Amino acid sequence: MSQSVSERTRIKSDRYESGVIPYAKMGYWDAAYAVKNTDVLALFRITPQPGVDPVEAAAAVAGESSTATWTVVWTDLLTACDRYRAKAYRVDPVPNTTDQYFAFIAYECDLFEEGSLANLTASIIGNVFGFKAVSALRLEDMRIPHSYLKTFQGPATGVIVERERLNKYGIPLLGATVKPKLGLSGKNYGRVVYEGLKGGLDFLKDDENINSQPFMRWRERFLYCMEGINRASAATGETKGSYLNITAGTMEEVYKRAEYAKTVGSIVVMIDLVMGYTAIQSAAIWARDNDLILHLHRAGNSTYARQKNHGINFRVICKWMRMCGVDHIHAGTVVGKLEGDPLMIKGFYDTLLLTHLNVNLPYGIFFEMTWASLRKCMPVASGGIHCGQMHQLVHYLGDDVVLQFGGGTIGHPDGIQAGATANRVALEAMILARNEGADYFNSDIGPQILRNAAKTCGPLQTALDLWKDISFNYTSTDTSDFSVTPTANV
């Protein structure tokens, strides 16, 4: 039933009465709100301060991440404030907790600048995480509408085009991070690259903190790496590469290093997450314009992504980075040395690889979302993995992944080339067994497949003997709220 003019006037008068009034009363809570296809949706895990009503806490987050301040301001009347206010429209208790709530908030798409992740995040996470009304706050998931997604370029190259360039289909890609990550000379660094690629890897990789230090300047590293790449490619007949880290202190220097990498023939460059969102988007645009693959190391992410009740779920970072336009991003291993619950990792991989996401609460996916025409982003599995885990890696991570064996290649007793060969033989044996219908994930059958392959591959046998007892059985801190799944790597 329509309201009378006098009733609408009274409501408006109450809303704009000078002073401090609850956020929910100011219009930031609307349980009857009908979500629009064009809305940006965010799901926050809210832990209200003792005595704070969860609905008011949700409304406060909605207000402070959109148009509100701590008191009523008359200049709201000069805007379409009823439209621009974010609306918290649903609050649910988090399963198996007593003080945490999932708050669903809708934002008008016009609140955000087109194609600017910096502007989107300035609102969504810019101010609310220090808000006194909540003792902890975590951004768990987002739905980005089709209309807003289309203002971002997405991955510069994408999974399909990368596979076409490498001529590798139906199998994970193999890589390794040069170790030690710091201290090598340029010549020795290039030798590591050559040995790894000659032994069967597709990629070598700079680590996140190798840029241009006194022991090895960036230009020296690029030249020796390309020498190793070219020699290995000529010897094997395969397209090879090494992720040349172009991260630097200024964008001018980033572009300088990127241009040099292109000039000397690299097919891929690398940046770190700590560069910042604007720098990442800029590098992605450059990579697409210059036809290079762009690898992103998620350096720094666990400072805000690991804790379950505060920060940003890495799933959201995956969405943001796919929008920004990176081609690769480290997304977890399940079985390695770094944080990784199986269901959470699967949710990250689906976010990067699927063209359409359906709601999947055990995977932590709360919203249905289409990726418009943005390309797929290749997940990278890195950190404490070795060839003895190959059956688990293939099972958990699938084909579209780069398996990065750093220590698991360079730590091989017979040398780097032997370590690379061990990984390649193990992978190809496991993929062959899978394609033939073997129950390769079985704890007896999977290891036996590797042992059989090792009968004709000495480096693989040596690796299996060396690392057979190595595992990282720790309970993950970030686990599904809707399913109990202990991390399994045995």
Curated annotation (Swiss-Prot):
Catalytic positions are 179, 297
Q: Where in the cell is it found?
A: Plastid, Chloroplast
Key words of the record: Calvin cycle, Carbon dioxide fixation, Chloroplast, Lyase, Magnesium, Metal-binding, Monooxygenase, Oxidoreductase, Photorespiration, Photosynthesis, Plastid
Chain sites annotated for binding substrate: 127, 177, 181, 298, 330, 382
Q: Which NCBIfam families match?
A: PRK04208.1
**Other facts noted in the record for this chain:** The basic functional RuBisCO is composed of a large chain homodimer in a 'head-to-tail' conformation. In form I RuBisCO this homodimer is arranged in a barrel-like tetramer with the small subunits forming a tetrameric 'cap' on each end of the 'barrel'.
Cofactor (UniProt): Mg(2+)
Which terms in the GO cellular component ontology are assigned? chloroplast
Quaternary state and interactors = Heterohexadecamer of 8 large chains and 8 small chains.
Q: Which GO terms describe its molecular function?
A: magnesium ion binding; monooxygenase activity; ribulose-bisphosphate carboxylase activity
Which reaction is recorded as catalysed by this protein? 2 (2R)-3-phosphoglycerate + 2 H(+) = D-ribulose 1,5-bisphosphate + CO2 + H2O; D-ribulose 1,5-bisphosphate + O2 = 2-phosphoglycolate + (2R)-3-phosphoglycerate + 2 H(+)
Q: Which residues carry this modification: N6-carboxylysine?
A: 205
Give binding positions for Mg(2+): 205, 207-208
Q: What is its EC number?
A: 4.1.1.39
| Top-level lineage group | Eukaryota
User: Per its UniProt record, what InterPro entries does this chain match?
Assistant: RuBisCO, RuBisCo_large_chain_AS, RuBisCO_lsu_C, RuBisCO_lsu_C_sf, RuBisCO_lsu_fd_N, RuBisCO_lsu_N_sf, RuBisCO_lsuI
What protein is this chain from? Answer: Ribulose bisphosphate carboxylase large chain
Where mainly located? plastid
Give the record's GO biological process terms. reductive pentose-phosphate cycle
PANTHER family (UniProt xref): RIBULOSE BISPHOSPHATE CARBOXYLASE, RIBULOSE BISPHOSPHATE CARBOXYLASE LARGE CHAIN
Query: Site Transition state stabilizer: which residues?
Result: 337
Entry's cofactor comment:
Binds 1 Mg(2+) ion per subunit.
From the broadest rank down, the organism's phylogenetic lineage runs: Eukaryota, Sar, Stramenopiles, Ochrophyta, Bacillariophyta
Q: Per the similarity annotation, which family is this?
A: Belongs to the RuBisCO large chain family. Type I subfamily.
Function recorded in the entry: RuBisCO catalyzes two reactions: the carboxylation of D-ribulose 1,5-bisphosphate, the primary event in carbon dioxide fixation, as well as the oxidative fragmentation of the pentose substrate in the photorespiration process. Both reactions occur simultaneously and in competition at the same active site.
